[in-house]
């Protein structure tokens, strides 16, 4: 079991030390469960009451938290404990690492360009013209279609499908079951008969992008679908053809984006939101969970829609009132006209 000293961890995050610099921990745990062999952190002041009784070997805290800690606690004091936790979690990450090399059962085209220290798992298929950068990891049963490019240090977990002509940048992480570059939902209707429109655009994904499990990103009809740098997309999202998502935007689970939508930079899209296509959302917009966006958003800010959870009895009353709004409006207008005549 690898161990990490207070001094070593402090160097990773530029922390101020209080306590025994030689104390060591093995892993990270929640504040209320951490043992003397574990590190923990606090990022919300409402949990300060737990600090004095914590058994953690190391506590990551802000300057404002120090007074609430036991005198004997070993502290890493930082400006932002949550960011420090994220950095340390990466440093101490125990997720299994794939060994470089190509599994015997993998099928790799002779025309594929394979970088240094690449790992290709069992039963993976790498088609003609594919380029894999250095240190790329392709998990078991993955498919990478013709002429696609995957940048250095990008990892595809098992069972990811990357269609043809897709470009994925460096340091990306794509979780199992994701599909990148499938056909967009493009059809023409000829007197009741649907005629499929071939989707010949690409998907272009920037650097440091993460895509969750079972998320689907469709290829463009003509122009590409684009995901810019540092975008994070959660599980079970649908990104339709020709969507363009700006740098630094975060998309929570279950979001549906219709075709030709442009989402600005540094937006936060809450879970299960549904967003209409052929329109734009400006930079720095937050859409709360289950938002239904039918019109463009031109001003930064927080936007919500829908009715928050109520008891069934309350909801039925609300629904009944909503259905009666038109009739009430007509009665109000009639009363206004009546009083105007007087």
UniProtKB/Swiss-Prot annotation:
Any one GO BP annotation for this protein: lipid A biosynthetic process
Top-level taxon: Bacteria
GO cellular component, one term: membrane
EC number per UniProt: 2.3.1.191
Active-site annotation: 241 (proton acceptor)
Alphabetized InterPro entries for the sequence: Hexapep, Hexapep_transf_CS, LpxD, Trimer_LpxA-like_sf, UDP_GlcNAc_AcTrfase_non-rep
Record's keyword annotation contains Lipid biosynthesis: yes
This protein's pathway: Bacterial outer membrane biogenesis; LPS lipid A biosynthesis
Gene Ontology molecular function, alphabetical: N-acyltransferase activity
Catalytic activity: a UDP-3-O-[(3R)-3-hydroxyacyl]-alpha-D-glucosamine + a (3R)-hydroxyacyl-[ACP] = a UDP-2-N,3-O-bis[(3R)-3-hydroxyacyl]-alpha-D-glucosamine + holo-[ACP] + H(+)
Keyword annotations: Acyltransferase, Lipid A biosynthesis, Lipid biosynthesis, Lipid metabolism, Repeat, Transferase
Gene3D superfamilies referenced in this protein's UniProt entry, alphabetically: 1.20.5.170, Hexapeptide repeat proteins (2.160.10.10), MurE/MurF, N-terminal domain (3.40.1390.10)
Subunit structure: Homotrimer.
NCBIfam families the UniProt entry points to: lipid_A_lpxD (TIGR01853), PRK00892.1 (NF002060)
Function description: Catalyzes the N-acylation of UDP-3-O-acylglucosamine using 3-hydroxyacyl-ACP as the acyl donor. Is involved in the biosynthesis of lipid A, a phosphorylated glycolipid that anchors the lipopolysaccharide to the outer membrane of the cell.
Family as reported in the entry's similarity comment: Belongs to the transferase hexapeptide repeat family. LpxD subfamily.
Record's protein name: UDP-3-O-acylglucosamine N-acyltransferase
Species of the source: Pasteurella multocida (strain Pm70)
């Amino acid at each position: 079991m690898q161990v990490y000293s207070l001094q070593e961890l402090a160097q990773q995050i530029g922390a101020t030390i209080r306590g025994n610099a030689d104390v060591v921990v093995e892993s990270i745990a929640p504040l209320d469960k951490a043992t003397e062999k574990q590190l923990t952190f606090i990022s919300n002041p409402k949990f300060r009451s737990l600090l004095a009784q914590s058994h953690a070997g190391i506590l990551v805290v802000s300057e404002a938290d120090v007074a609430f800690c036991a005198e004997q606690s070993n502290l890493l004091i930082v400006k932002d404990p949550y960011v420090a936790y994220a950095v340390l979690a990466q440093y101490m990450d125990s997720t299994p690492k794939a060994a470089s090399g190509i599994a015997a059962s993998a099928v790799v085209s002779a025309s594929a360009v394979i970088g240094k220290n690449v790992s290709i798992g069992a039963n993976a298929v790498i088609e003609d013209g594919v380029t894999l950068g250095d240190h790329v990891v392709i998990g078991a049963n993955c498919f990478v279609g013709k002429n696609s490019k995957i940048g250095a240090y990008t990892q595809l977990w098992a069972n990811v499908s990357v269609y043809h002509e897709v470009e994925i940048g460096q340091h990306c992480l794509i979780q199992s079951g994701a599909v990148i570059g499938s056909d967009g939902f493009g059809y023409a209707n000829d007197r009741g008969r649907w005629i499929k429109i071939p989707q010949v655009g690409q998907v272009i994904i920037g650097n440091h992008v993460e895509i969750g499990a079972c998320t689907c990103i469709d290829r463009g009809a003509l122009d590409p679908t684009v995901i810019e740098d540092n975008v994070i997309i959660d599980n079970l999202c649908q990104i339709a053809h020709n969507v363009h998502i700006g740098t630094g935007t975060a998309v929570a689970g279950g979001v549906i984006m219709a075709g030709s939508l442009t989402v600005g930079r540094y937006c936060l899209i809450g879970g299960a939101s549904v967003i209409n296509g052929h329109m734009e959302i400006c930079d720095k917009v937050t859409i709360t969970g289950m938002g239904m966006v039918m019109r463009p958003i031109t001003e930064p800010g927080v936007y919500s829609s829908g009715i928050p959870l109520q008891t069934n009895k309350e909801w039925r009353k609300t629904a009944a009132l909503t259905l009666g709004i038109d009739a009430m409006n007509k009665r109000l207008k009639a009363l206004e006209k009546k009083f105007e005549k007087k």
